[in-house]
């Protein structure tokens, strides 16, 4: 019997199942249906330019969408957000990838730097603003998630 070389952990319904592979899982020439779903994109590319790059009333650019989740890229560069936003349909999780922006919310004000993540609950008014640490490239990823979320990531 051949030696197990590769292990795969599959999570189904909160349970983990371990599968043994004798060939690398990356060798999979048989997957053709929905092959376009597996995609690498560079959010710094100029082709992903949202209207909020240089417009105060501009909005982020939608990259992915489903009924329950949306993924946007934001590149606010020149102007503070000219309006307050209140998403009553979804929580918003904001990841700062590059640069820095200040977020005013009904719950308080924070300044985000690369590596920071901000959770804005459904229904909370907010807006982003330039700050002293902002650069010519302030890049954020924004997830809009309609499902209820519970924070489970407390570091040990």
What are these regions (language model features)?
Residues 61-65, 81-88, 105, 129-131:
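Short histidine-centered beta-strand/loop micro-motifs
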Residues 76, 86-103, 144-146:
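Short, conserved beta-strand element in jelly-roll/cupin
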Residues 106-122:
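Short acidic-glycine-tyrosine-enriched beta hairpin
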Residues 119, 134-153:
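A short hydrophobic beta-strand segment most commonly corresponding to one strand
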């Amino acid at each position: 019997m051949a030696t197990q070389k590769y292990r795969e952990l599959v999570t189904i319904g909160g349970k983990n199942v371990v599968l043994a592979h004798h060939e690398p899982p990356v060798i999979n020439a048989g997957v053709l249906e929905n092959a376009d779903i597996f995609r690498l994109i560079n959010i710094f590319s100029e082709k992903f330019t949202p209207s909020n790059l240089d417009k105060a009333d501009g909005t982020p650019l939608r990259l992915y969408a489903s009924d329950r989740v949306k993924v946007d890229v934001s590149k606010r560069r020149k102007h503070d957000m000219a309006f307050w936003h209140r998403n009553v349909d979804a929580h918003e999780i904001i990841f700062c990838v590059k640069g820095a922006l200040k977020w005013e919310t009904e719950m308080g004000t924070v300044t985000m730097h690369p590596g920071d993540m901000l959770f804005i609950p459904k229904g909370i008014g907010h807006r982003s603003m330039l700050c002293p640490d902002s650069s010519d490239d302030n890049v954020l990823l924004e997830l809009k998630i309609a499902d209820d979320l519970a924070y489970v990531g407390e570091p040990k």
